[in-house]
Swiss-Prot record:
Coiled coil: none annotated. The keyword Transferase does not apply. This is Mitochondrial adenyl nucleotide antiporter SLC25A24-B. Ca(2+) 4 binds at D135, D137, T139, T141, E146. Ca(2+) 1 binds at D32, N34, D36, K38, E43. It comes from Xenopus laevis (African clawed frog). It is found in: Mitochondrion inner membrane. PANTHER family: SOLUTE CARRIER FAMILY 25 (PTHR24089). Monomer. Residues 19-54, 55-88, 86-121, 122-157 form the EF-hand domain. Residues 1-197, 272-294, 365-387, 465-473 are mitochondrial intermembrane. The lineage of its organism: Eukaryota, Metazoa, Chordata, Craniata, Vertebrata. InterPro entries: EF-hand-dom_pair, EF_Hand_1_Ca_BS, EF_hand_dom, GDC-like, Mit_carrier, Mitochondrial_sb/sol_carrier, Mt_carrier_dom_sf.
Amino acid sequence: MLEQVQKFLLSRAACQGSDSQSRYEELFHKLDVNKDGKVDILELQEGLKAMGMEVGKGAEEKIVAAGDTNKDGHLDFGEFIRYLEEHEKKMKIAFTSLDKNKDGKIESAEIMNSLKVLGIKISLDHADKILKSMDSDGTLTVDWNEWRDHFLFNPADNIQQIIRYWKHSTVLDIGDSLTIPDEFTEEEKKTGQWWKQLMAGGMAGAVSRTGTAPLDRLKVMMQVHGSKGNSNIITGLKQMVKEGGIRSLWRGNGVNVIKIAPETAMKFWAYEQYKKLFTSESGKLGTAERFVAGSLAGATAQTSIYPMEVLKTRLAVGRTGQYSGMFDCAKKIMQKEGIRAFYKGYIPNILGIIPYAGIDLAIYETLKNYWLQNHAKDSANPGVLVLLGCGTASSTCGQLASYPLALIRTRMQAQASIEGAPQLNMGGLFRKIVAKEGFLGLYRGIGPNFLKVLPAVSISYVVYEKMKVQLGI
């Protein structure tokens, strides 16, 4: 992909030990078309295009944003050199992490094994394709010079792109918090990119949940007040507006957004701790171990913030004027029902993690690996439609499997607030719902829940991409 740039760089190296700065200096003067001592985005785009270099979408903007220390929209010679030197250090870390046998060369097997550790399985043929795209001398191995020159103007290397493009739970937020946490590479941990990605994901989740809050509240209302005559989505929305006005459609959304930060932080911390227990002697964490560690991390995070889940449900089903806010709701629950009320529905909630997370992970990994095996050619980027499609499909299947438990959890959280309602346990509620409404009653409210999936993942993806630019990811 970068053959002409590689030839340009290599042909101007006086010898193998040639100083990097002299090569970068000559490259700068070639890109500086108008000879004003600065390189802007347009010059970078045209210069790289003229050299036959195909970079990812928005790569030029990211390069200028990352290197432009004085924020004048250009890269002067000093900024240009500093950016490439810093980028070269990052590329060296990535190269070293892939070169498992420390022979100074990367082979197809090392590419396969490195991706396998992260749950990405590719064939030997696909690994060969990745390697050949970097192999300029036809040796079927990639040394440091080939690696450096291939990724000189890519904000990320190809292996990192495969991992980053296919991150799932960090990028897509559909309102449920039962997904397995994403893996962060050693480079992302060392450079601090991990917390920026979590922050971007948190902001994406907040905007996504707020945008789909009316459908989420309608789902809760249909779960709690389920009946065969109360299943029309439009009618349900009209009733909520009639009872409390337009603002009532967002009742309970504040708690739903606030809990993102502590839950994400706890899940990430717990996942890192559980991974240490399940990592093999070779340092590898397989898909099965990742599922167990991720499920335990999800259970730990849910346990820590579960009272907020109860508050969200109570606020959502509450009447207008019943609670003045989150703290008033918590105070009234404590006074009337005691502290145990904040963990009503906890058992079905924890049990729901296993089918949701397991099926979501299995289907997403299957779809991801199928695309990588059959459709990935020169780029690791699957495109927005493929990403959203895979995320939507896996999440939908996970929801179908765990929805009955989610419905029972919501009923248990809310039943004490309904006058005259008996306080049933999980088994009692299950039998009552099946006897009164049939097995379809266990899926009451799934209509608005499915309706919000596509807009939720779309909103979260767009916001996540915008936040990545703002945070310099």
